[in-house]
């Protein structure tokens, strides 16, 4: 995979194949990403409704979803549970980008990955050039958001 750019603290856009752009979260030597991502706009009320395979270090370890009715993502690790536990612990050491006094949870990371996947899908991002433009825009927005809540 070719790295395209850092979107936000620990989130990277990556080129997965010739016409596929993805996003992954990195902490230490670990990566977290979503595969077979499906967004359900009609079911999204307070949060984004989605379902996906949860991938850690390149291996599908389970599935994740959000019903879209508020609250955080649900995930179920049905394989490599020790790896999932280890990565969840590593994630809990990372500060939230917008709220530095708060530590992240694996649910936060999954929801943010889903949000980035929706941006990629809705903007039909399939090229590195377009992905770089989206990275630039998202970084500008994140800086504005962080200043608002600083």
Regions found by a protein language model. Give the residues of each.
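Terminal leader/tail segments of proteins
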Residues: 2-150
């Amino acid at each position: 995979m070719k790295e395209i750019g850092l979107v936000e603290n620990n989130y990277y856009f990556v080129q997965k194949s010739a016409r596929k752009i993805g996003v992954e979260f990195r902490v230490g030597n670990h990566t977290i990403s979503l595969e077979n991502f499906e967004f359900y706009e009609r079911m999204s009320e307070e949060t984004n409704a989605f379902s996906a395979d949860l991938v850690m270090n390149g291996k599908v370890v389970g599935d994740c979803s959000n019903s879209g009715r508020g609250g955080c993502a649900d995930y179920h690790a049905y394989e490599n549970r020790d790896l999932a536990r280890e990565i969840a612990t590593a994630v809990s050491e990372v500060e939230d980008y917008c709220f530095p006094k708060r530590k992240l949870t694996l649910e936060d990371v999954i929801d943010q990955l889903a949000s980035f996947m929706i941006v990629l899908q809705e903007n039909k991002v399939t090229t590195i050039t377009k992905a770089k433009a989206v990275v630039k825009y998202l970084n500008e927005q994140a800086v504005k958001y962080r200043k608002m809540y600083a």
